Amino acid sequence: MKYIGAHVSAAGGLDQAPARAHALEATAFALFTKNQRQWKAAPLTDDAIDAFRAACTRYGYQSQQILPHDSYLINLGHPVTEALEKSRGAFIDEMQRCADLGLTLLNFHPGSHLLQIDERDCLSRIAESINLALSQTQGVCAVIENTAGQGSNLGFRFEQLAAIIEQVEDKSRVGVCIDTCHAFAAGYDLRDEAACGETFAQFSRTVGFSYLRGMHLNDAKSAFNSRVDRHQSLGEGNIGDAAFRWIMRDPRFDGIPLILETTDPGRWQDEIAWLKAQQTAE
């Protein structure tokens, strides 16, 4: 079964996120468990935790259908020790928030070398950061998102994702989320079924579908291999709709959250309905 949804707002309380997802007729959703542009957040109260869990139960969402995203400020490969420690502390806090909420996944951007250390060193720092977080938390899988490779961001090549995973000690608690816009901007073609087949054959060989824990389904305003991260509504960007039809009909993408981060929230309900329909369309 495909779990299809969008990254919804938690404004007004975390329990509002599952309600908003339900209103979209989504079978999955993503959210931030705290303000994504601030380092610190007040600890979750028992009331907030209970309300979120109750809302998930009320609307039929289980942990495997929910893909929380961490703060944009966190850089687990930061070249400066003090800044790296700050990011690691914030990431551990986010992992613990997920555990408290009964969630089992935390999606994050791997990190950036900021042109100050080499790629290999940065990838090792990211893996060390994951190991530290896993050692201090329980029950939550660290889900590395591929990037577009904009600036000094790593994680835009499947080989980089594999290099991080190789250095993670507990392989049962690490996975990946593939963002279609990011992959396309990083040079992985998705414009037709043959291209999709080849791109995901590369993914299978290099990383492995056993590590796939979620996807972000976004068309791309940015050009192929541009290393620029610009999302677009489905079928209106440079990827086109063939990739999304292909994904919907491939059972390797069953049982994981497939999350829209497209640019017009007013179209999410229609996009979700269209994606659902592609599973059985001829």
Swiss-Prot record:
InterPro entries: AP_endonuc_2, AP_endonuc_F2_Zn_BS, Xyl_isomerase-like_sf, Xyl_isomerase-like_TIM-brl. It catalyses: Endonucleolytic cleavage to 5'-phosphooligonucleotide end-products. This is Probable endonuclease 4. It is an enzyme of class 3 (hydrolase). Binds 3 Zn(2+) ions. Transmembrane segments: none annotated. The gene is nfo. PANTHER family: APURINIC-APYRIMIDINIC ENDONUCLEASE, ENDONUCLEASE IV ENDODEOXYRIBONUCLEASE IV. Zn(2+) 2 binds at E145, D179, H216, E261. It holds the Pfam family AP_endonuc_2. Belongs to the AP endonuclease 2 family. One of its GO terms (molecular function) is zinc ion binding.
